[in-house]
C-alpha cells in the first residue's frame, strides 16, 4: 500500500526517519484545507477525494512505526487497502495503534502538527519503557534486536 508513497517521494522503507516524516507531513499538509472543517458534508467529500493518498500515508507511517519502535500489522496488505479499521499490534510500550483511523483524525484535527506530536509521544513512551525495563532487569525484544 505504501509503495506509491515510496515511489512518489523517491524513498524506501530504509530511508532516514526524518526524510520519511518530512514527506508524510508535506503530503498531509498539501491536501489539508481548513475550510472543510466548518462543513461536515464537505469534509466527507474531501475525504473521498483524498482517501487513497491518506491510506498510502497511513501505510508509510505504520511502516515507520514498525521500523523505529516495533510491532506488526494486524491484517495483510490486501485487507488493509480496503478498510479504515486496520491497526498495528504488539507495539512495545503502546500496544495497538489504529491506522489509518488515527492518521485520518490527525488530518481532520490539526494535520501534520498532530501527527508529529503523536509520533514523538510514541517514541518517548518506547524510550521510557526500555529504560524502565533495563532498571528492572527485564530483557526486551528491543534489546535483543539491537534497537537500543
Stretch-by-stretch model annotation:
Residues 9, 68-69, 136:
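Residues at alpha-helix termini
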Residues 85-148:
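A recognition module on extended beta-rich or small alphabeta surfaces enriched in W/G with H and D/E
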Residues 28, 38-39, 53, 65, ...:
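Alpha-helical protein-protein interaction elements
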Residues 48-109:
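Amphipathic protein-protein interaction modules
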Residues 4, 22-26, 30-34, 67, ...:
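Charged/polar, solvent-exposed surface patches and flexible loops
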Residues 35, 46, 60, 118-121:
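Intrinsically disordered, low-complexity N-terminal regions enriched in serine/proline/glycine
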Residues 1-53:
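N-terminal low-complexity, intrinsically disordered segments
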Amino acid at each position: 500500500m505504501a509503495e506509491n508513497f515510496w515511489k512518489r517521494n523517491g524513498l524506501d522503507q530504509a530511508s532516514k526517519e526524518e526524510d520519511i516524516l518530512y514527506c508524510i507531513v508535506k503530503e498531509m499538509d498539501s491536501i489539508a484545507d481548513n475550510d472543510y472543517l466548518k462543513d461536515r458534508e464537505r469534509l466527507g467529500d474531501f475525504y473521498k477525494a483524498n482517501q487513497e493518498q491518506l491510506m498510502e500515508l497511513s501505510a508509510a507511517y505504520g511502516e515507520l512505526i514498525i521500523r523505529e519502535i516495533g510491532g506488526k500489522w494486524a491484517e495483510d496488505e490486501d485487507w488493509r487497502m480496503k478498510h479504515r479499521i486496520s491497526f498495528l499490534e504488539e507495539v512495545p510500550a503502546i500496544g495497538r495503534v489504529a491506522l489509518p483511523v488515527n492518521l485520518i483524525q490527525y488530518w481532520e484535527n490539526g494535520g501534520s502538527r498532530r501527527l508529529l506530536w503523536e509520533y514523538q509521544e510514541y517514541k518517548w513512551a518506547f524510550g521510557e519503557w526500555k529504560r524502565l525495563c533495563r532498571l528492572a532487569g527485564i530483557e526486551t525484544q528491543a534489546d535483543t534486536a539491537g534497537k537500543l
